[in-house]
A protein has these predicted regions:
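Nucleotidyltransferase catalytic core that binds NTPs
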Residues: 1-124
């Protein structure tokens, strides 16, 4: 079974999110869409504009098959912690991850990922 995961907040859900669902369905029509969404608090500890139930219902209504809640400790952490937790959770059962980006240039994204994973950047 194909499963596409999305790490999200939907604060609020908008037409860009709907377009993401449409693009997933277009590229992989048989894939289930699972959203891992922050709860009533979003990144940086801000309260969400709408409660988590309403935001989850909007996602389901617009095409998501399942909405799960990102643990609050992950939602309230740094952007890196938010993303890393989401990838760790969804990576356990999703075949694909879908995300929006400021650039459509995949080469820029891949070079950035390589840099972030390099020994020069990580001092682990």
């Amino acid at each position: 079974m194909e499963i596409t995961g999305i790490i999200c907040e939907y604060n609020p859900f908008h037409t860009g999110h709907l377009k993401q669902f449409s693009m997933i369905r277009e590229k992989n029509p048989d894939s289930a869409i699972v959203c891992l969404m922050s709860g009533n608090f979003v990144q940086r500890g801000m309260p969400a504009i709408f409660d988590k139930e309403l935001r989850a219902r909007a996602a389901i209504y617009c095409g998501a098959d399942l909405v799960l809640e990102l643990p609050v400790t992950a939602a309230l952490s740094s952007a890196e912690g938010f993303a890393a937790s989401g990838v760790r959770i969804l990576g356990g059962f999703c075949n694909h991850l879908s995300f929006g980006a400021e650039t459509p240039n995949i080469d820029v994204l891949l070079k950035t990922a390589d840099a972030l994973l390099s020994a020069d950047f990580n001092l682990d």
